[in-house]
């Protein structure tokens, strides 16, 4: 009998390869938990596709109909967002603007049924010198700034609330001010010049080169690992991209850059999970790294898409980010209590007023603490549990050689 995590990975594997699950039986409580887990990982439509003809699932008609109905709704909504995004990108083309697309539609197209792999937003990388032109074009298209004070940041978010279209414009792929992963930008010097043209649904799109995109997917997951975690869908994206674009990827360069950033064991673990759980061959460039995956796989499956399903785990990211930042800069790591009072820069994304009024940092600390103690929608809040999770996840980073 498979547990819920095993059922999810089995369903995802089938959906990725255009197959259907072959389950002999499943209890109603198991199916209910599986559906909820698929929501947390944003793969519910793929679960529905894989389980569509499964007699065992159909023995629970209420849950089966709920699954199919919700999957159809999400897939239709994603198809509309994709169409709206392509219309938006065509509008930019007409303006002579060619931003580089990362993730999003470029990952969706890897799957047998692209719009079953849902995306909340679309990410665009631009030349910082052209930001004013892009900003003007987005406003003209009818989009609004999510945060009017964020236009000077490395990323700026826009939303069309009528179309439910969410766009993130990046001046760099990673926050250069981050002590933990700001150095992840280095391999992408010249990425705009190396970008390539592709086509999707008749629209010409510009995206990262195959090698740059492969590396970016790995590093993006690494960033989320530090911030609380990343889910099985991101691992699927990475492995699918590596498999589909493998001949176009400079794997030697990927391995070299991973070693520079000390994430080669982490990358090897993801590819091993792809081979063991998702039936996608491990790239030869990482075949020599024999690595256990049990702890990383559990971390991925237990945290949802971005490790924020548990509020205590979400807050534990302060500890993991601090551990890597200290390791990278060679300074002494701050204690757990100090991590509860992060520097202004670390809180600016959440408390926009700090950008213009840095002296309000103590107020932000108080607001953050109050929110932490009163928030309940993702489960009971416990500072001690957050510290415990943080310490456990620091050991995970140590296991994969990310920190010493």
What label would you give each PLM region?
Residues 1-120, 126-404:
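Conserved NTP-donor binding/palm subdomain of two-metal-ion nucleotidyltransferases/polymerases, i.e.
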